[in-house]
């Protein structure tokens, strides 16, 4: 069961990690919906929490697509490149 993630935690993940989190959340949502349909779901709030987690992940992915925020791996790599270039000069 995936814990409720904050947007800041999601922004610190790489693109591949976000895709993995999204896949896990969608699988969990599928399982929860199946449990609800068969009457086995004991915690209805979990459905809402997982849907919100999926929305948060999509939001972070869209922010990166629009250039509002960057991929932390790419941002760290760019900072390292800038540091080495300034040392060479």
From Swiss-Prot:
GO molecular function annotations of the record: structural constituent of ribosome
Disulphide-bonded residues: none
Cellular component aspect of the GO annotation: cytosolic large ribosomal subunit
UniProt cross-references to NCBIfam families, sorted A to Z: L29
GO BP annotation list: translation
Taxonomic placement: Bacteria, Bacillati, Actinomycetota, Actinomycetes, Frankiales
Keyword flag Metal-binding: no
Source species of the chain: Frankia alni (strain DSM 45986 / CECT 9034 / ACN14a)
Protein name: Large ribosomal subunit protein uL29
Sorted UniProt keywords: Ribonucleoprotein, Ribosomal protein
Residue runs in coiled coils: none
Family classification: Belongs to the universal ribosomal protein uL29 family.
Cited SUPFAM superfamilies: Ribosomal protein L29 (L29p) (SSF46561)
């Amino acid at each position: 069961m995936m814990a409720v993630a904050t947007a800041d935690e999601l922004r610190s993940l790489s693109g591949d990690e976000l895709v993995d989190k999204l896949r896990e959340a969608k699988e969990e949502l599928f399982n929860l919906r199946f449990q609800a349909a068969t009457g086995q779901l004991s915690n209805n709030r979990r459905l809402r929490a997982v849907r919100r987690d999926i929305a948060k992940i999509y939001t972070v992915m869209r922010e990166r697509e629009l250039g509002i925020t960057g991929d932390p791996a790419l941002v760290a790599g760019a900072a390292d490149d800038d540091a080495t270039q300034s040392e060479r000069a």
